[in-house]
């Protein structure tokens, strides 16, 4: 079985929900969360600028995530995270911040630390992440 499939299965189990996202979907949810904290209200164009992707890509992702129950859009086309979407976004963002902070603390260039954190945040299992977090806290 491929590693990424195992990670996704663990993620599903962790959320106690049959719905799951892809790495790209998690990136979109994380971006919406970050932008909501920064701007309050989020539009597709904001997500496109933040992620440096095309507006059609955002529209496709928003549609897919809406169908999955991760977000909604209102009559003014603002994007809102559902409880499920917020849960996923917050978990991914927490991991991102954790890895970025610790990579920088060991001397990794901030840009490289951000890029590496963005990759690792999706693939690490919940169990491994929690054990790593515990071990760092104990030190």
Segments predicted by a language model, with ranges:
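C-terminal regulatory/oligomerization modules of transcriptional regulators
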Residues: 2-13, 115-139
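N-terminal helix-turn-helix DNA-binding core of bacterial DNA-binding proteins
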Residues: 16-53
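N-terminal positioning helix adjacent to the helix-turn-helix/winged-helix DNA-binding module
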Residues: 24-27, 43, 84, 95, ...
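Residue-level recognition of specific faces of alpha-helices
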Residues: 31, 61-64, 70, 84, ...
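Canonical helix-turn-helix DNA-binding module
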Residues: 44-75, 79
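Basic, amphipathic "hinge/linker" alpha-helix immediately C-terminal to the N-terminal HTH DNA-binding motif
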Residues: 77-95
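Arg/Lys-rich, alpha-helical DNA-contact motif
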Residues: 93-126
């Amino acid at each position: 079985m491929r590693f990424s499939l195992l990670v996704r299965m663990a993620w599903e189990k962790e959320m106690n929900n049959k719905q799951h996202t892809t790495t790209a979907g998690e990136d979109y949810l994380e971006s919406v969360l970050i932008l909501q904290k920064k701007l309050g209200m989020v539009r597709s164009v904001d997500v496109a600028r933040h992620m440096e992707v095309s507006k059609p890509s955002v529209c496709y992702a928003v549609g897919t995530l809406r169908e999955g129950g991760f977000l909604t859009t209102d009559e003014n086309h603002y994007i809102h995270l559902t409880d499920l979407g917020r849960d996923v976004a917050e978990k991914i963002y927490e991991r991102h911040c954790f890895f970025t902070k610790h990579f920088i603390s060991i001397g990794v260039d901030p840009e490289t630390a951000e890029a590496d954190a963005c990759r690792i945040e999706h693939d690490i299992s919940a169990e491994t992440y929690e054990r790593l977090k515990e071990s760092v806290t104990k030190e």
